[in-house]
C-alpha cells in the first residue's frame, strides 16, 4: 500500500470533516430537542432565516424552538447538553479509529461541538446572570467561522503529518 501524500490527506480530511460536521450539527440539534423534552419542555426543530452581521443577507439554519420558556436552569441544560451529547458518539469512534485522517476529522468535530456547548451555555449565562450581551456569539459568521477555522486547522494537521521528513539517526 502506498503512502498517502500531504495533498491527498488534506482533501480526504476536508471531505470527511465536512461530512461529519453535517451529521454532528444535525445530531446536536436533535439532542437539544431530546434534552428539552427530558427537562419537561416541548418544542420542535425548525429551519429559520439567520441574519448575517457583516453582510446584508440571510442564511438558513436548523434551530430548536421551545413552545414556551423552560426557565434558566433547564435552558442551560438544553443549551449545553445538546452539543455535548452529540460529541459522545464521535468520541467513541475516536477511541477506536486508527487512520490519521479519520482521527483528525473526528477531533475537529469533537472540538467544534465543545465550542458550541461553551458558547451556547456561556451566552445564556452572560445574558441572564450578568446582563452582558455579546452579540457576536449569536452571529452566523462567528458560529460558522470558528468551526471553519477548526476544520482548516484539521486539514493543515493532516497535510503536515503526511509531509514531515523523518531522518533516521543512529
Predicted regions and their residues:
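Metalloprotease/metallohydrolase-associated module, dominated by Zn2+-dependent proteases
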Residues: 56-165
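Short, charged juxtamembrane terminal tails flanking transmembrane helices
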Residues: 2-3, 161-170
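Feature targets compositionally biased, intrinsically disordered low-complexity regions
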Residues: 5, 40-42, 169
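Start-transfer (signal-anchor) and selected internal transmembrane alpha helices
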Residues: 1-13
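Small-residue-rich helix-interface/hinge motifs
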Residues: 20-71
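Membrane-embedded alpha-helical segments that form the functional core of polytopic membrane enzymes
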Residues: 10-24
Amino acid at each position: 500500500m502506498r503512502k498517502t501524500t500531504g495533498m491527498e490527506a488534506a482533501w480526504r480530511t476536508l471531505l470527511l470533516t465536512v461530512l461529519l460536521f453535517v451529521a454532528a450539527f444535525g445530531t446536536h440539534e436533535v439532542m437539544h430537542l431530546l434534552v428539552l423534552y427530558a427537562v419537561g419542555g416541548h418544542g420542535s426543530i425548525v429551519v429559520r432565516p439567520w441574519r448575517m452581521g457583516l453582510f446584508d443577507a440571510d442564511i438558513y439554519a436548523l434551530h430548536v424552538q421551545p413552545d414556551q420558556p423552560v426557565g434558566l436552569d433547564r435552558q442551560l441544560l438544553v443549551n449545553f447538553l445538546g452539543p455535548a451529547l452529540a460529541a459522545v458518539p464521535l468520541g467513541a469512534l475516536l477511541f477506536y479509529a486508527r487512520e490519521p485522517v479519520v482521527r483528525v476529522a473526528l477531533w475537529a468535530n469533537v472540538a467544534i461541538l465543545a465550542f458550541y456547548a461553551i458558547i451556547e451555555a456561556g451566552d445564556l449565562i452572560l445574558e441572564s446572570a450578568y446582563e452582558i450581551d455579546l452579540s457576536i456569539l449569536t452571529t452566523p459568521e462567528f458560529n460558522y467561522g470558528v468551526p471553519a477555522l477548526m476544520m482548516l486547522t484539521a486539514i493543515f494537521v493532516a497535510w503536515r503529518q503526511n509531509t514531515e521528513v523523518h531522518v533516521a539517526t543512529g
